[in-house]
Curated annotation (Swiss-Prot):
Pathway: tRNA modification; tRNA-queuosine biosynthesis. PANTHER family: S-ADENOSYLMETHIONINE:TRNA RIBOSYLTRANSFERASE-ISOMERASE. It comes from the Bacteria. HAMAP family: QueA. GO terms for biological process: queuosine biosynthetic process; tRNA wobble guanine modification. This is S-adenosylmethionine:tRNA ribosyltransferase-isomerase.
Length: 357
């Protein structure tokens, strides 16, 4: 398939710039993957879409304040986006500056603070920085960093973003982008789902800035996927196996939960699913045979992105494009702070071997 197969026109006005005041007030477009039928509602309709015994798998990563502004000794401005914490005093970053700095260069970080750092190494397009202070780098980021809003939200972060660009159940700091499908869950909804007998389990995938990298190859199979850290525990494995045994659905909350579960399944030998922790660069696109996930809760994604390719692989290419057309016609809100979909798996999606325009 070609990159252009995943293109669509999206009015700029539909790109959500701010979150809703109440997380669960967003709209929900439900797509039956097998039949292609769609129904519209609100996010709390999940209480009726999900059944007793279904298993929700959520990603419990937390976003670090990864965007930091700083200065060179010359006074020139720079900006870093932390991609990964390497050690208590070393981080791997994307660096934006008028000129590429040399190894050994020193900077001062913080809007008003003057935290000294040194450029220690370069790894392809990323730079390794050392914090030259005693404080832990992660703790320093909490005080000097900004919430790294996505490129399609071209504004400075605001106090509400520090709360609403995090899931209510996030526990493990390490992401530079939110697992956005999870942003719609608030505690009252989670409690109501639990009361209805819906089970929950938590994977961890620290979303990297690579999630926003565009696909540049015309033949999508030639795209090289970015790498992220993921963890699927024995507790999650047990919950998935129990869910399958009782004939219920594993419902992934977000594409990161999908990628975590399907990575663990791919790495498993001689059984259905075993625990996994490590790097994943799994790229799911049409033709992929899903092994674990039965239903998916996800936001509306960018044209030509690896995320819409994953959705097409799950729901079927034609179903997905029809759903997106409906969402645009009905003025759903798109991307990180936008509305959501609930999709049941299309068992014939992997056999869709040609694109109809």
């Amino acid at each position: 398939m070609r990159l252009s197969d995943f293109s669509f026109e999206l009015p700029e006005s539909l790109v959500a710039q701010y979150p809703l005041e109440k997380r669960s007030d967003c709209r929900l477009l439900c797509l039956n993957g097998e039949t292609g039928t769609m129904t519209e509602g609100v996010f709390t309709d999940l209480l009726y879409q999900l059944e007793q015994g279904d298993l929700l798998v959520l990603n419990n990563t937390r976003v670090i304040p990864a965007r930091v502004f700083g200065r060179k000794p010359s006074g020139g401005k720079l900006e870093i986006l932390v991609e990964r914490i390497l050690s208590p005093n070393r981080v791997l970053v994307h660096l934006k500056s008028s000129k590429t700095p040399k190894l050994g260069a020193q900077f001062l970080l913080g809007d008003t603070a003057n935290i000294p750092v040194t450029l220690m190494a370069r790894h392809a397009s990323l730079f390794e920085l050392r914090f030259d202070v005693r404080e832990d780098a992660l703790m320093l980021l909490q005080s000097i960093g900004h919430i790294p809003l996505p490129p399609y939200i071209p504004r400075a972060d605001e106090p509400k973003d520090h709360e609403l660009y995090q899931t209510v159940y996030g526990q493990h700091l390490g992401a530079v982008a939110a697992p956005t499908a999870g942003l719609h869950f608030d505690n009252p909804l989670l409690n109501a789902l639990k009361a209805r007998g819906i089970e929950t389990a938590f994977v961890t995938l620290h979303v990297g800035a690579g999630t926003f990298q565009p696909v540049k190859t015309d033949n999508i199979t030639e795209h090289v996927m970015h790498s992220e850290y993921a963890e699927v525990s024995q507790e999650v494995v047990d919950a998935v196996l129990a869910c399958k045994a009782r004939g219920k659905r594993v419902v992934a909350v977000g594409t990161t939960s999908v990628r975590s579960l399907e990575t663990a399944a791919q790495k498993t030998k001689n059984s259905f699913l075993t625990p996994f922790s490590g790097e994943t660069s799994i790229f799911i696109y049409p033709g992929y045979q899903y092994q674990i996930v039965d239903a998916l809760i996800t936001n509306f994604h960018l044209p030509k992105s690896t995320l819409i390719m994953l959705v097409c692989a799950f729901a079927g290419y034609q179903n997905t494009l029809r759903a997106y057309k409906k969402a645009i016609d009905e003025k759903y809100r798109f991307f990180s702070y936008g509305d959501a979909m609930f999709i049941s798996h299309n068992p014939k999606a992997a056999q869709e071997n040609r694109v109809k325009k």
